[in-house]
């Protein structure tokens, strides 16, 4: 007789059976998959013992290949071999063509302006290409673990915006994977090192991969990982080192700038090989397109020094955001294959005043951290005391009257988080409100980034200031934002999930935080002026309504005094003198006090008409 299998609701029927989870580092140049086995996190290798999977896909009419096989076709079939697709994720076609004008692919724009790559397999978008890489990694994990994955944690750069994060999730779904969560790459590295060393204090995670740079300042204390600040550049990485060196080799060899794609690929391959060799050797011989020459490490360092300096400027900004000095940082974790470049390690060590940590393979550390987190989230370590707190990189807020930005969630707030603020109507009888969601650090709308707009309709027709609208911002663990606006008395609401069609540009990423510091004093003055102008408009709007309703309560002389005060306020409100506007508002208030008192008395008399004192 078979036994009846009983389990608690929501739990596995076999509660002690280990669930299969993996951490995936979906990188620009290379990707990895890792898992926890026998209590140890490890990356999984292919049949030839290779842990890295080149993030390259080669498409043909009858199928595609991923990884090393695809990379060998890069020089032979450039148009159908897609590499560094992570850089294209969440970007518009116009943005890609401006940012990467020399890509060997042919693009078409979809109806909404997103890029479609022409291949032998048809038109493909970056999400589909990323999904094919994820499928290859998942297949490696499934084979190694002898079972289907119950869930994965996928890492993304800390500076990925909502569109890029959503694109990563969409790619995972297309690959048939259940995403437990997205995890910032520097945070994943902190998990790996934090568990291994148990170090407490402030740690900097310097992550220089193939296509992105991230710097995170974290505090580790008693198993708690708190991200104090983040910074970086979503379009700076080792690929840029490669292209600079390739351009240098092309100039030395006298190869035309607009040579065919095959030669361009040969140049890039030669540059990559030279870069790797120069990590150990002081010079290297390069052979390309019939040219042979010598390149020294000193020449390479001179080429990349400006890019390394850019990363250190981002480090300085992140430290300032965190309120931490460089000498307070206990350890510096190096992440990403590009941190093997000697100049990078040297300059980072000089900046922080200590040698950086490289005890965990910088190519593998992110995947290892993701695997540890996946093992916890899938339920294999339910008693884990580790707490992970990510942050949002830029403030989120709303546009208010006068073109001002009201910050609802400040930057570097830990996520997930939900914050709400109450707003009200500006005009009498206002029945709708436009909600404009902003991102950035400046005080004025014109200096911040627009994320989304939506409207709340069905607001009760009440006097100005009578309706109360609560706007709630909610950022989930993956950094995706949803905004809800609700009118309190009726419960009517509207909401939106913010998924911009493409990401921040280089200049926006680099300058938004910097500008907020450079223009801080100017912005405060501009905000004060805008606030006074809004208050002046509100006072005049209210006064005009009152005069239209109860002008009979005033004598001709009294009306003239009020009209003169209002005209003066209207005139000075067109200027830029904050004090003059403030004094004019006070003057209108002073000249209308008796009028306001008479209106109040009249309202009371009307309310009491027909009622006895006892009834009241």
From Swiss-Prot:
InterPro entries: ATPase_NBD, Heat_shock_70_CS, HscA_NBD, HSP70_C_sf, HSP70_peptide-bd_sf, Hsp_70_fam, ISC_FeS_clus_asmbl_HscA. It comes from the Bacteria. Keywords: ATP-binding, Chaperone, Nucleotide-binding. GO terms for molecular function: ATP binding; ATP hydrolysis activity; ATP-dependent protein folding chaperone; unfolded protein binding. Pfam families: HSP70. Coiled coil: none annotated. CDD domains: ASKHA_NBD_HSP70_HscA. GO terms for biological process: iron-sulfur cluster assembly. Chaperone involved in the maturation of iron-sulfur cluster-containing proteins. Has a low intrinsic ATPase activity which is markedly stimulated by HscB. Involved in the maturation of IscU. HAMAP family: HscA (MF_00679). Belongs to the heat shock protein 70 family. This is Chaperone protein HscA. It comes from Escherichia coli O7:K1 (strain IAI39 / ExPEC). The lineage of its organism: Bacteria, Pseudomonadati, Pseudomonadota, Gammaproteobacteria, Enterobacterales.
């Amino acid at each position: 007789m078979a036994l009846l299998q009983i389990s608690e609701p929501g739990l596995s029927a076999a509660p002690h059976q280990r669930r299969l989870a993996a951490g995936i580092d979906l990188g620009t140049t290379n990707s990895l998959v890792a898992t926890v086995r026998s209590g140890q996190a490890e990356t999984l290798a292919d049949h030839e013992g290779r842990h890295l999977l080149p993030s390259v896909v080669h498409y043909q009419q009858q199928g595609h290949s991923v990884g090393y096989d695809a990379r060998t076709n890069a020089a032979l079939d450039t148009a159908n071999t897609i590499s560094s697709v992570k850089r294209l994720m969440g970007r518009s076609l116009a943005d890609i063509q401006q940012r990467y004008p020399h890509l060997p692919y042919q693009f078409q724009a979809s109806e909404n302006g997103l890029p479609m790559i022409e291949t032998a397999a048809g038109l493909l978008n970056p999400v589909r290409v990323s999904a094919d890489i994820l499928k290859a990694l998942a297949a490696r994990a499934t084979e190694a673990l002898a079972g289907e994955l119950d869930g994965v944690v996928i890492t993304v750069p800390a500076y990925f915006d909502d569109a890029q994060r959503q694109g990563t999730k969409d790619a995972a779904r297309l690959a048939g994977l259940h995403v437990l969560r997205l995890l910032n790459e520097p945070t994943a590295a902190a998990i790996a090192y934090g568990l291994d060393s148990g170090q407490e204090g402030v740690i900097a995670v310097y992550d220089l991969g193939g296509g992105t740079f991230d710097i995170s300042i974290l505090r580790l204390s008693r198993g708690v990982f708190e991200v104090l600040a983040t910074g970086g550049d979503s379009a700076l990485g080792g690929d840029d080192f490669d292209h600079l060196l390739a351009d240098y080799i092309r100039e030395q060899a006298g190869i035309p700038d607009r040579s065919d794609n095959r030669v361009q690929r040969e140049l890039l391959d030669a540059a990559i090989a030279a870069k790797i060799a120069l990590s150990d050797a002081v010079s290297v011989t390069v052979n390309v397109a019939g040219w042979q020459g010598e390149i020294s490490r000193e020449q390479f360092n001179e080429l990349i020094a400006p890019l390394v300096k850019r990363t250190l400027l981002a480090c300085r900004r992140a430290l300032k955001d965190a309120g931490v000095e460089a000498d307070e940082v206990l350890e510096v974790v190096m992440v990403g294959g590009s941190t093997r470049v000697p100049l990078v390690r040297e300059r980072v060590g000089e900046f922080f005043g200590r040698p950086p940590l490289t005890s965990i393979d910088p190519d593998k550390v992110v995947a290892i951290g993701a695997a540890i987190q996946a093992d916890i989230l899938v339920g294999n370590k339910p008693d884990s005391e580790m707490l992970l707190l990510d942050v949002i990189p830029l403030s989120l807020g709303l546009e208010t009257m006068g073109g001002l930005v009201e910050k609802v969630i400040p930057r570097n707030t830990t996520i997930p988080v939900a914050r709400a603020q109450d707003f009200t109507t500006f005009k009498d009888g206002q029945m709708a409100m436009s909600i404009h969601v902003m991102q950035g650090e400046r005080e004025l709308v014109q200096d911040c980034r627009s994320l989304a707009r939506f409207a709340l309709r069905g607001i009760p027709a009440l006097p100005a200031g009578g309706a109360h609208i609560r706007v709630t911002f909610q950022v989930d663990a993956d950094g995706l934002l949803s905004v809800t606006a609700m009118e309190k008395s009726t419960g009517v609401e509207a909401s939106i999930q913010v998924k911009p069609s493409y990401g921040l540009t280089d200049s926006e990423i680099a300058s938004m935080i910097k500008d907020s510091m450079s223009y801080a004093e100017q912005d405060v003055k501009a905000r004060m002026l805008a606030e006074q102008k809004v208050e002046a408009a509100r006072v005049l709007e209210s006064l005009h309504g009152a005069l239209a309703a109860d002008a009979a309560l005033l004598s001709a002389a009294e009306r003239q005094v009020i009209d003169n005060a209002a005209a003066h306020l209207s005139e000075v409100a067109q200027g830029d003198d904050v004090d003059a506007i403030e004094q004019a508002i006070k003057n209108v208030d002073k000249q209308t006090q008796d009028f306001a008192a008479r209106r109040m008395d009249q309202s009371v008399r009307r309310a009491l008409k027909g009622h006895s004192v006892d009834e009241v």
